[in-house]
């Protein structure tokens, strides 16, 4: 447990210090002259801290970089699961949004009139005039971009998280616990890691009655569900790159359904997958994936990738070991 403790301490300390010291002032306007786009980049930089936590832990404990869970096991076996990681989140988000709009049909707006009007107002504020048809085409063009390009374009930052969570923490914890508690506990940890951002409105806003605890709890639930999906593709490929692609796909498509919402929806409900109905397809698939992982574990066929070395072993010990 030593390396797990060091990883979590470093990752949480660096992330929360950065978010309280830099992200909070930037988001509140205390740091003047920072445009909104720059604020997004400042916030996104926090995604690198889990990877830094892995680096510090591996170096400080002389673990080295054996079993880094980056190289896939084989193209033929891995490729289908990379495809699941790439396209699965968009498909599940669409299904969840469809369920939401079936439950709340009055919120469905196929013409995207709310977003069209908002975009036209923003353009008018800069002295430009955009026809509604042009804006509609611009908005629709974002969807194939989110499906086909966002997963790989986002991988630079999502790998920063996934090398830490699916590439280190989950496999480490799984050596001490069975797969079900491993994924429940690590999912909650991942959700709590987001807590400072959740407090200032990430995913769930700030104007709800149970702020901020309700948002933190909802984020933990979302992270448990998504964490199961990302762990599953990691197990099937042997590489946390699959999780990084899946994470990038989720981030790229998470807000797509809002284009078709009259009201903007409710983040706790839908149509975004962070809501209980918008995320219903994710929940169902995650339940099947968790059941399959549990079944494989009972049968002794769960091939969980190994991260690094056992707590009582260093790379120097391996070097001294007799060669067979």
Q: Residue locations for each model-derived region?
A:
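Alpha-helical transmembrane segments
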Residues: 4-16, 83-93
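Transmembrane alpha-helix/helix-exit interface in multi-pass inner-membrane proteins
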Residues: 94-110, 161-162, 181-202
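Residue-level signature of the transmembrane alpha-helical core
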Residues: 8-12, 48, 86-87, 147, ...
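Membrane-interface interhelical connector segments
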Residues: 123-126, 169, 198-211
């Amino acid at each position: 447990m030593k390396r797990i403790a060091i990883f979590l301490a470093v990752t949480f300390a660096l992330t929360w210090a950065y978010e309280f010291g830099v992200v909070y002032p930037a988001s509140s306007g205390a740091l003047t002259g920072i445009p909104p786009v720059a604020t997004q980049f400042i916030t996104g930089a926090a995604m690198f801290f889990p990877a830094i936590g892995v680096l510090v832990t591996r170096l400080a404990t002389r673990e080295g970089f054996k079993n880094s869970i980056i190289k896939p096991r084989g193209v033929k076996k891995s490729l289908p699961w990379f495809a699941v990681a790439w396209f699965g989140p968009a498909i599940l988000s669409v299904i969840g949004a469809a369920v939401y709009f079936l439950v709340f049909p009055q919120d469905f707006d196929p013409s995207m009139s709310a977003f069209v009007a908002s975009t036209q107002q923003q353009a008018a504020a800069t002295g430009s005039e955009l026809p509604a048809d042009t804006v509609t085409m611009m908005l629709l063009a974002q969807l194939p971009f989110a499906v086909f390009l966002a997963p790989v374009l986002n991988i630079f930052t999502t790998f920063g998280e996934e090398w830490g969570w699916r590439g280190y923490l989950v496999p480490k914890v799984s050596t001490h616990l069975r797969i079900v508690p491993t994924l429940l506990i690590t999912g909650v940890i991942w959700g709590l890691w987001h807590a400072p951002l959740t407090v200032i409105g990430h995913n769930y806003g700030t104007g709800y009655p149970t702020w901020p605890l309700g948002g933190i709890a909802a984020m933990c639930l979302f992270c448990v569900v998504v964490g199961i999906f990302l762990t599953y593709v990691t197990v099937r490929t042997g590489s946390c790159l699959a999780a990084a692609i899946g994470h990038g796909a989720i981030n790229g498509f998470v807000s797509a359904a809002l284009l078709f919402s009259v009201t903007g929806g409710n983040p706790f409900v839908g149509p975004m997958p962070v809501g209980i109905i918008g995320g219903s397809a994710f929940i169902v698939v995650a339940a099947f994936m968790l059941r399959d992982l549990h079944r494989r574990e009972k049968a002794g066929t769960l091939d969980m990738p190994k991260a690094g070395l056992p707590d009582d072993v260093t790379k120097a010990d391996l070097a001294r070991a007799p060669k067979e």
